[in-house]
């Protein structure tokens, strides 16, 4: 069993009693699920239900790091705020976007800096943009409606969870790490690898999409090889994702050398920095909504773009070496590196 499978089963069991309060009866399932993912991070992140009113109301939950829990006989530190933001939890009947637009969430955002809004079946992370205004950062819905959600969970919670386990785990960990200042290459690599793994999953699910053939041709011509058979198909999809995400990172590295610290990077317009024609061709095809909209790669590249714009450049480049770019951006979980270092080296050429 997995954390998400357990979450769905717990929700189902509480629902099946017929005696549950729509919102609060399920708090424990949210706490258990988020703690299961939080303990995999360093430092660990732990969910605490119902925080004190510090002036903005009583959040349904807050996300604290391990260092915030006082050890030994010392008294707890008074007035601590959760380092990784808070949560606003409503019943499955509520709409996440309407919850997000509420005055209460606005107060939490101003006070805590980040709010995870959820109705147990749909998750939305809200943060602040460069001007301090509310911004919807990432969203993860399990179903389009309350009825559909309960139907799936009650029919087979494990099978339903299996559809989302990897991608949701990546999402919830990104939620916990959103507030962390990005100064280390390995932290940036974690975020980009997280989006890359999710992108690879999406491409795997859409492997029969005819529009992928155009991308295949572009890569085959660039690499001087042909993707054949099942192994070739796997290598093609892995190489596609690596090319896109390494490309966007490499473009950011070169772009950063020429632009002021307060300017914002845009992966769509900065790809020419790489001076690699195949990257420009790939980006054009991926960004073309009529061709590859179903893949969802544009949204994942947009999220990666936001990560790059969060980097504290001066500190980052003190620790970063271009010669180690491939090492820093090691996309695990089945992404093949065969023949790929040549492409990366070309991307980083000024």
State each model region's role.
Residues 30-33, 37, 59-63, 85-87:
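Central hydrophobic cores of alpha-helical transmembrane segments in multi-pass inner-membrane proteins
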Residues 1-41, 45-50, 247, 266-269, ...:
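Charged, often low-complexity linker/regulatory segments
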Residues 53-55, 63-67, 90-94, 333-336:
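Short, flexible loop/turn elements at secondary-structure junctions
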Residues 257, 261, 272, 279, ...:
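Class I S-adenosyl-L-methionine
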């Amino acid at each position: 069993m997995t954390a998400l499978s357990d979450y769905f089963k717990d929700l189902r069991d509480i629902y099946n009693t017929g005696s549950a309060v729509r919102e609060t009866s399920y708090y424990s399932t949210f706490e258990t699920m988020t703690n299961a993912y939080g303990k995999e991070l360093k430092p660990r992140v732990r969910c605490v239900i119902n925080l004190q009113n510090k002036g903005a109301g009583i959040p349904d939950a807050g996300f604290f790091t391990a260092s915030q829990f006082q050890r030994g006989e010392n008294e707890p530190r008074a007035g601590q705020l959760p380092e990784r933001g808070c949560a606003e939890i409503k019943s499955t009947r509520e709409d996440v976007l309407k919850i997000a637009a509420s005055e209460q969430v606005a107060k939490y955002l101003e006070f805590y800096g980040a709010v995870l809004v959820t109705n147990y079946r749909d998750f939305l992370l809200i943060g602040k943009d460069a001007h301090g205004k509310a911004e919807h950062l990432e969203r993860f819905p399990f179903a389009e409606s309350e009825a559909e959600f309960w139907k799936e969970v009650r029919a087979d919670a494990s099978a339903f969870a299996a559809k989302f386990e990897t991608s949701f785990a990546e999402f919830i960990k990104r939620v916990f790490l959103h507030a962390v200042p990005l100064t280390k290459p390995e932290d940036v690599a974690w975020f980009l690898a997280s989006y890359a793994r999710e992108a690879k999953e999406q491409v795997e699910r859409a492997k029969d999409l005819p529009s992928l053939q155009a991308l295949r041709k572009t890569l085959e011509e660039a690499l001087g090889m042909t993707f054949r058979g099942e192994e070739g198909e796997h290598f093609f999809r892995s190489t596609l994702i690596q090319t896109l995400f390494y490309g966007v990172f490499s473009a950011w590295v070169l772009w950063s050398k020429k632009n002021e610290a307060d300017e914002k990077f845009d992966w769509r317009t900065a790809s020419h920095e790489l001076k690699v024609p195949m990257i420009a061709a790939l980006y054009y095809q991926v960004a073309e909504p009529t061709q590859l909209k179903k893949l969802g790669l544009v949204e994942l590249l947009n999220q990666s773009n936001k990560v790059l714009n969060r980097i504290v450049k001066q500190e980052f480049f003190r620790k970063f070496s271009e010669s180690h770019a491939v090492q820093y951006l090691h996309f695990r979980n089945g992404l093949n590196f065969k023949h790929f270092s040549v492409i990366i080296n070309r991307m980083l050429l000024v």
